[in-house]
Amino acid sequence: MSDLINIQQKLLPDVLAVMQKRYQILRSIYFAEPVGRRTLAGMLGMSERVLRGEVEFLKAQGLIDIASSGMTVTKEGLIVFRDLEGIMNQLSGLHSAENRLAELLQIKKCLVVQGDSDITPWVREEMGRVAVKQLDLALVEKRNVVAVMGGSTMATFADTMPSDFAKGRELLFVPGRGGIGEDLDNQANTICDRIATKTGTKHRVLYVPEQLGEEAYQSLMKEPAIQEGLRLVQSANAIVHGIGDALTMAKRRHTSDEVIEKITRLSAVGEAFGYYFNEQGEVVHKVSTFGLQFEDLAKIPHIIVVAGGTSKAKAIKSYMKSAPENTILVTDEGAANMLLNGSKAHLK
């Protein structure tokens, strides 16, 4: 396939340019549907006049439908879109970027989706879909315990989970941490419940505050029910989690002014599992949390991290300096460009 693409680039470059343009239109309609022509033109940076001709072509081919509510992708259009993904990623340089990024971060694998989730929110949905596929490939055992962390990215991951995900496997989804006091929709408990309900699988809850004072923390750790819940979480053979911006996460957790001053003074840029990392990957602060600890990751065979957007690049880089080598990172062009080039330039 790559040889054919190289030949086409030399002999028929215009054909490939048209194919890329129509793929981008189809992709944008799929993630924003139903979407109007004016909105789509703005998303793509294309004039309505030029877009009108392309949309009419896609409709004539049966790839999209046009209604008063907006444009949507047909079943045939979705098949074409999925079939084109690999080719388009190769043409855009994404495959090469993925390999370079994995080498830079010294982890098992990187997968980069087109776009920047800071600018285009539906890019996060695409990252979620890719993460679901990676989890599906990882769960080769008959019985699996999957730990899922909280956060808005993980909530999107849950939304992209297909109803037939179990495929005959016995799956138990467990929250990687407690979450009382956090936004309900983004709590790990809630996300596990949504995934289990959607896929017809099982889940457990960990109804304890995400963070407590040291005395209360040590007291609760002695409770048999808490210990049993933590043992179950620690037995996970796969985990899916995000990476947070340090200050954003601290404020979201209603952290004291004293601690915020500390992590600011010590230049924390990233956060995961209650650990705050500086740009060198050093832990500059840790909060006592109920659930998986960073050191527990060494025992988990399959680790999938989902984080994207230009604004997350420093957080991703800081965390990956300590991440296990078997980590798979699902990110977007926005973060990948900053990590590889230190700029927003397009990946090449």
Residue locations for each model-derived region?
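ATP/nucleoside-binding phosphotransfer catalytic cores, i.e., glycine-rich phosphate-binding loops
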Residues: 9-17, 32, 52, 76-77, ...
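HTH-adjacent hinge/linker in prokaryotic transcriptional regulators
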Residues: 60-142, 159, 165-166, 184
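Short Gly/Thr/Asp-enriched flexible loops that form oxyanion-binding sites at enzyme active sites
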Residues: 153-165, 251-259
